Design a protein with these regions (language model features):
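Glycine-rich adenosine-cofactor-binding loop
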Residues: 10, 92-98, 105, 109, ...
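Phosphate/diphosphate ligand-binding glycine-rich loop within oxidoreductases
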Residues: 2-111
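Anionic-ligand binding region
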Residues: 145-169
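Short phosphate-engaging motifs
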Residues: 60-63, 134, 158
């Protein structure tokens, strides 16, 4: 892999552990910077002008989804992204929140008493707190495993009353 430049966009992000995780994961081989601004368009332009990939956090996950040229299947199901990568075909969006939550739910379910297989075998109910990009990813992951999902948020948002399938459009 060629040497690239990577970063994180969102606001606020000064508290983020992403730089330390990225540095540890790639043993410091690639630069990773915080692009902190409340203006999504400014952050996105900085990505286009000087970065190969960026992690995306609140409040930009849904805005970044709209900007992507290519969407992973997870992103299409959720309507949000937490990772943008430049490719020869354009900017591709991924959602590792979805993949991580799905793996975790399967792992936790397998450890539950009277469970001898993955989470798709029995009815399980989960509560998702939050309806932003990460909450949507968690709900989609749980629903993909056949779990019954209840969503809760501190403020009422119109999309809370819509079935998750509507977000796939």
């Amino acid at each position: 892999m060629r040497h690239g430049k990577f970063g994180l966009i969102g606001h606020p992000i000064g508290h983020s552990l992403s730089p330390a995780l990225f540095k540890a994961g790639y043993e410091g081989r690639y630069p990773y910077e915080l692009i902190e601004t409340a203006d999504f368009e400014e952050a996105y332009m900085r990505f286009l002008e000087g970065y190969d990939g960026i992690n995306v956090t609140a409040p930009f996950k849904e805005l970044a989804y709209v900007k992507a040229d290519i969407l992973s299947e997870e992103c299409k199901a959720i309507g949000a992204t937490n990772l943008l990568v430049k490719t020869p075909e354009g900017v591709k969006a991924y959602n590792s929140d979805y993949l991580g939550v799905k793996m975790w739910l399967n792992e936790v379910y397998a450890e539950m008493p009277e469970s001898n297989s993955d989470a798709t075998e029995k009815e399980v109910s989960v509560l998702i707190v939050g309806t932003g990009g990460a909450g949507k990813a968690a709900a989609a992951a749980a629903e993909s495993l056949g779990m019954r999902v209840t969503r809760m948020n501190r403020t009422v948002r119109d999309e809370m009353t819509r079935p998750l399938e509507d977000f796939r459009e």
